[in-house]
């Protein structure tokens, strides 16, 4: 079931979420957590066993934790209710009809961790892609699974940088 939000009749994200949760659904998708009231309801619902999915405007997966904390959600509630956060970017795809190999300088290969056999392409432009070299988009995802250490870091109010450093080192 999908419920439209209509502020003219006082049907906000928060009031719609309350109504949905009274029906004890297996999964709830909240279009976007925009305010403290909706965040609080979603977090408390997840603590009672509801599976809640939602979106937030952040730059990366760790930013979701900070965003919810900035909305007033207590760190112990975040660490108890969050299982995973993710972020996505849509990147342009190189046109398959006009792609051609491109040389990558050795210093850049090393910096990017590219194997010497890895072929890097660029699109030269053709009729199929409107001479842009690109055709379509592809999602690039960043996923943060919250293990016990990350949850402990949240409770201790660790910075985004500290959580990111831990995740890069331990959660690959």
Each language-model region and where it sits:
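Short, flexible helix-loop junctions that flank or precede catalytic/ligand sites
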Residues: 1-172
């Amino acid at each position: 079931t999908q419920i439209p939000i209509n502020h003219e009749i006082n049907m906000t994200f928060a009031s719609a979420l309350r109504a949905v949760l009274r029906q004890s659904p297996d999964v709830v998708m909240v279009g976007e957590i925009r305010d403290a009231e909706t965040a609080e309801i979603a977090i408390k619902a997840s603590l009672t066993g509801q599976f809640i999915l939602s979106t937030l405007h952040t730059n990366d997966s760790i930013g979701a934790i900070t965003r919810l904390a900035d909305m007033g959600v207590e760190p112990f509630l975040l660490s108890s209710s969050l299982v995973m956060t993710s972020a996505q970017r849509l990147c342009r795809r190189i046109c398959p009809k006009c792609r051609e190999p491109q040389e990558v300088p050795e210093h850049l290969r090393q910096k990017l961790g590219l194997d010497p056999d890895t072929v890097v392409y660029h699109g030269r432009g053709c009729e199929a892609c409107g001479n842009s070299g690109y055709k379509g988009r592809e999602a690039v995802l960043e996923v943060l699974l919250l293990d016990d250490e990350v949850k402990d870091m949240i409770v201790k109010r660790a910075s985004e940088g500290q959580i990111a450093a831990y995740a890069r080192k331990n959660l690959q």
